């Protein structure tokens, strides 16, 4: 005699808007909801191209939403200085269209590319703690598995890089972060870059030429060049 059929729902790829998995982050968002009630003020979902997830060959993973960027707009990297650098590069190499200088991603459409963050909620002072990074892996893991045609992952910053390596079941020591470094894991090519934050760009840790070279490399991979 067989038991009842148990149907297990697939893991969620995006947290609910009222997620309270990380108390410090949910409290921080609650404060933003009071200050700016018309903003997104919640976990930021993965941004897909207009053609949907089956068109995605490249996934870009950043650190976390910016307070006045993605936390306001609800789309990763949109509305802040890091988005200005990212979308300019994606547009130059055929991975996005519609970028206008100074728009910080407003009005952009992605091409064959999805964008997400290792931590989905805006953290105080843009600094998530280890427990929050680990908790949000519950969404990063199914996001990495979501795209049937995914070929490459571009990680922006060491935290995003390490989170992706762990989410794919790898050891960080075997796949260390380095600007422009590439490593293979679970059938994917992981490409790393310093984060395109205003601080990194202003201090010269990351120049436009350095960032453009990495985007050109990953574009060549997913576009078959």
What is the predicted function of each stretch?
Residues 3-224:
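A polyanion-binding, active-site-adjacent surface
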């Amino acid at each position: 005699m067989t038991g009842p059929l148990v149907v297990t729902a697939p893991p969620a790829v995006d947290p609910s808007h009222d997620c309270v998995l990380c108390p410090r982050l949910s409290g921080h968002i609650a404060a933003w909801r009071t200050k700016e009630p018309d903003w997104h003020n919640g976990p930021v979902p993965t941004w897909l191209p207009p053609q949907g997830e089956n068109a995605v060959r490249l996934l870009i993973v950043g650190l976390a939403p910016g307070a006045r960027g993605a936390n306001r707009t609800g789309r990763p990297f949109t509305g802040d200085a890091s988005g200005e650098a990212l979308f300019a590069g994606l547009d130059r190499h055929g991975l996005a269209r519609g970028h206008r200088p100074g728009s910080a991603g407003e009005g952009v459409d992605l091409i064959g590319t999805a964008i997400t963050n290792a931590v989905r909620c805006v953290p105080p002072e843009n600094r998530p703690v280890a427990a929050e990074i680990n908790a949000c892996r519950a969404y990063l893991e199914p996001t990495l598995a979501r795209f049937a045609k995914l070929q490459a992952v571009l990680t922006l910053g060491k935290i995003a890089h390490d989170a992706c390596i762990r989410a794919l079941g790898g050891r960080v020591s075997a796949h260390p972060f380095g600007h422009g470094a590439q490593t293979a894991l679970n059938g994917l090519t992981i490409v790393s870059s310093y984060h395109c934050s205003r601080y990194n760009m202003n201090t010269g840790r990351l120049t436009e030429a350095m960032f453009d070279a990495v985007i050109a490399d990953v574009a060549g991979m997913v576009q078959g060049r």
